[in-house]
Amino acid sequence: MLPEILKLRSTFTQYFEIVPAFSDALRDEVFSIRHQVYCEDLAFEPRRPDKRESDEYDAQSLHMLIRNVRTGEFVGCTRIIRVRPDDPQQLLPFELSCAKTIDRSIIDPATLRRSSIAEISRLAIISPYRRRKGESRKPAPMSDSDFVMISHPRFPFIPVGLYFGTVELARLHGIETLFFLTEPRLASHFKKLGVRIQTIGPAIEHHGLRIPSMMSTSTVINDLKTILRPLYHTIAKEIEAGLTDASSRATSEPAGRVLQAAVTK
């Protein structure tokens, strides 16, 4: 078991690193990837003249990238949409799109402390890294064959790395519950990793069938399979390094140049 554990971590670090996107330049990379995937490849959103996809939720979000360490190319991204601190009753996007379908006997987001919840969205991977058969029309693909064995060479390092980074970034900002709209099979994929994703309502149509779901950051960390813990801890260190760097810039740059969410919890 130990060689497999070490191989999983070493393989990830040999090819990829997680980079919190707290600077203007890094957020620009996020918006560029999103335009490539959501506007050009999938046509989920209209193309923009500046080739940057962004919306009204980006200013209140925590953004993250994954980079190919061999080429320096950023190959994927995601974000965590937080409730605005100046408007705690603001509804997250899934609360609007699933207002009539959330099973509030399972969980009612309206009753939770708003600063402790957030929504994962805009997870995207550029096309050269999702070109296996049947995956080109998905922003961040995974398949059953990826999970035959966790140490299998097809292990989906990019989407798993982004999800692990999201959980750790959320934890560091006091977010306990993460909501998201997911493809129907994602819960079964992540169950193989020891990650419990709970469905909180029936599927809705949102660029294909999407199921409103949730996961607890503390439960994900506590229940993670042993073989994956070193990988998670490596990603956690990369997140922490990004936060430290952002905090350092905040003391030396003019106010407003660094994303406020990066240095406040």
Short names for language-model regions:
Residues E53-E56, A203:
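Short Gly/Pro-enriched turn/cap motifs at secondary-structure boundaries
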Residues E4-R52, A59, H63-R70, R79-R82:
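Short amphipathic alpha-helix that is part of the acyltransferase structural core
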Residues P85-M214:
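Acyl-donor binding region in acyl/amide transferases
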Residues P49, L92-S97, P156-V160, H173, ...:
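Structured alpha-helical
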Residues T71-C77, A118:
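Glycine-rich phosphate/pyrophosphate-binding loop shared by adenosine-nucleotide-utilizing enzymes
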Residues G194-S252:
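Accessory, usually C-terminal, subdomains that scaffold auxiliary metal cofactors
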Residues C77-I80, D87-P88:
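Hydrophobic alpha-helical segments and helix pairs
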